[in-house]
Amino acid sequence: STLSSSSAASDVYKRQDGTVAFMVGGDENTFEKYKEILFKMGSSVTRCGELGAGNTTKLANQIIVAGNIQAVSEAFILAKKAGVNPECVFEAIKGGLAGSTVMNAKVPMMINDDVKPGFRVDLHIKDLNNALECAHSVGAVVPMTSQIQEIMQYLHNNGDGSSDHSAIIHYYEKLADIKL
């Protein structure tokens, strides 16, 4: 019976408040035997398939998180450049379809330029590199992932490697010549 090392989607704050999401790959009997242990550490435990499926699911998660932060950064810089208060935009959007857990966690950090690490840019670069490698190995096309990986690499090269990944806003601030 085999259970792969489960992957966890979290940042420092989610680990502190116990809302870690575990994505597990391995055989079902072993998963059933050990899932309660994982529930003691997190709020969500999902068997995603056989050995390796948990890791692949984590890579998919990281693509979505990075893409969400990128989209939020672009949208909020657009609003700011157009003269709309970012806090008003956040209040207006967060309850609708575009609202998300990522937006709720990261926009206040962006508005306050608080890039104290929850999940570091350098760790996200590693995950996106792994996602690109996985995509290439299975023949998946992931152009957005390539773009966001380049943005994160820019952040690393410009001193934000140890910052929270919400520092993506710095890239857009530089391009737009405006602070959020």
PLM regions and their residue ranges:
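Conserved Rossmann-fold dehydrogenase catalytic segment
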Residues: 14-19, 40-64, 107-114, 144-146
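Short polybasic/polar patches that bind polyanions
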Residues: 80, 136, 156, 170, ...
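Single conserved hydrophobic/aromatic residue that forms the stacking wall/gate
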Residues: 1-13
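Short, basic/aromatic-enriched C-terminal tail that caps enzymatic domains
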Residues: 164-180
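Interdomain hinge/lid region at the active-site interface
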Residues: 51, 55, 99-101, 105-165
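Short acidic/histidine-centered micro-motifs embedded in hydrophobic/aromatic stretches
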Residues: 78, 92-96, 147-154, 171
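Internal alpha-helical scaffold of NAD(P)-dependent oxidoreductase catalytic cores
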Residues: 23-57, 65-100, 134
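Short, conserved glycine- and acidic-residue-centered signature motifs
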Residues: 5, 68, 124
